[in-house]
């Protein structure tokens, strides 16, 4: 919205500052954090009043989790308010990439909200039907993938790029849509599974957002893209502003989510944030790099897949409990040890992922 002020830059030269993505990214970060700080307490109080018993605690989970009973969920609403408000204020609303990323965030967030609602009202960790939820996610993600492919230039827009290789492209054609949808849905559910401990998902999401903020800015800048010999994707630089808002909203939410958490993110937030990051990866043509930068999320979702698959085939469990962060709790790690050590892993993987921009 503030981009509209650029039209007055001839009369007021100071308004030229709104042309700069870096300035607006910083503004989006601060604004999103301020919105969450400002409205967070009221949202928490309202959710606590309406939810009563709060998020149900799994009976087979670590014993230390039972003290969290009564903590409200749906904290993703706080993150939503920060990201949406800040993005509308600081983002370039003429960018198709801005709208498609926000669309996925809202769509996935709505699915997560309904899932949280069912869990709270039924007081069961079993919420929305898994098949129905995945079907809706793939519809939203598939539509987003189609928009992204249509917004670019063929054959590049339907091609898959590879890290460490300058010119290697694999044109997927129409199959780009299901591939991209899989990336977006996978990212959403991977972050969702990671969100099992206070602050565990929040910081890695911010780390991934910061990493892809850099990637989006460089990919959307012809000069930097040429220098680094990465693929230039016009218009994706604007996604840095949205990702700045994600970081700001994450910082604001972490204030309330730090242990002992006053509120949980819930599927409302985790699905939305994962879907958003996945969509940015697709738009910037860094889908494979997402698996590196978001490697912690990949580990979490793979631990669940392996656990379920092996148990169905052999009746035995690979991990004491899945997702894998609960496995380490069962081994005797304290919650803070698991969270901080996983944060460190997320930062290291993000740095490795960013190194692919230069190692070509």
Swiss-Prot record:
Pathway: Cell wall biogenesis; peptidoglycan biosynthesis. CDD domains: GT_MraY. It comes from the Bacteria. GO terms for biological process: cell division; cell wall organization; peptidoglycan biosynthetic process; regulation of cell shape. Belongs to the glycosyltransferase 4 family. MraY subfamily. Catalyzes the initial step of the lipid cycle reactions in the biosynthesis of the cell wall peptidoglycan: transfers peptidoglycan precursor phospho-MurNAc-pentapeptide from UDP-MurNAc-pentapeptide onto the lipid carrier undecaprenyl phosphate, yielding undecaprenyl-pyrophosphoryl-MurNAc-pentapeptide, known as lipid I. This is Phospho-N-acetylmuramoyl-pentapeptide-transferase. It comes from Chelativorans sp. (strain BNC1).
């Amino acid at each position: 919205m503030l981009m509209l002020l650029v039209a007055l830059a001839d009369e007021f030269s100071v308004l030229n500052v709104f042309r700069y993505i870096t300035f607006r990214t910083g503004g989006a970060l601060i604004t999103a954090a301020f919105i969450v700080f400002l409205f967070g307490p009221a949202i928490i109080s309202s959710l606590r009043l309406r939810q009563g018993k709060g998020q149900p605690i799994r009976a087979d989970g670590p014993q230390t989790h039972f003290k969290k009973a009564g903590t409200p969920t749906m904290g993703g609403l706080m993150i939503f308010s920060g990201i949406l408000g800040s993005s509308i204020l600081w983002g370039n609303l003429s960018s198709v990439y801005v709208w498609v990323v926000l669309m996925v965030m809202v769509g996935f967030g709505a699915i997560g909200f309904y899932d949280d609602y069912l869990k709270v009202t039924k007081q069961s960790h079993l919420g929305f039907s898994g098949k129905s939820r995945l079907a809706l996610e793939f519809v939203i993600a598939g539509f987003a993938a189609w928009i992204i492919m249509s917004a670019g230039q063929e054959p590049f827009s339907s091609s898959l790029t590879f890290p460490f290789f300058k010119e290697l492209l694999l044109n997927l054609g129409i199959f780009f849509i299901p591939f991209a949808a899989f990336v977006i849905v996978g990212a959403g559910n991977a972050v969702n599974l990671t969100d099992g401990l206070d602050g565990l998902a929040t910081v890695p999401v911010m780390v991934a957002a910061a990493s892809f903020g850099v990637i989006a800015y460089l990919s959307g800048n012809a000069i930097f893209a040429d220098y680094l010999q990465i693929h230039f994707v016009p218009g994706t630089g604007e996604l840095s502003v949205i990702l700045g808002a994600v970081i700001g909203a994450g910082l604001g939410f972490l204030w309330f989510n730090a242990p002992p958490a006053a509120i949980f993110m819930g599927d409302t937030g985790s699905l939305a944030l994962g879907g958003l990051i996945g969509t940015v990866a697709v738009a910037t043509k860094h889908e494979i790099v997402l698996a590196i930068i978001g490697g912690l999320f990949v580990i979490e979702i793979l631990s669940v897949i392996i656990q379920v698959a092996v148990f169905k085939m052999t009746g035995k469990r690979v991990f004491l409990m899945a997702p894998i962060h609960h496995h380490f709790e069962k081994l005797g790690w304290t919650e803070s040890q698991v969270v901080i050590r996983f944060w460190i892993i997320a930062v290291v993987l993000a740095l490795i992922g960013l190194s692919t921009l230069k190692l070509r």
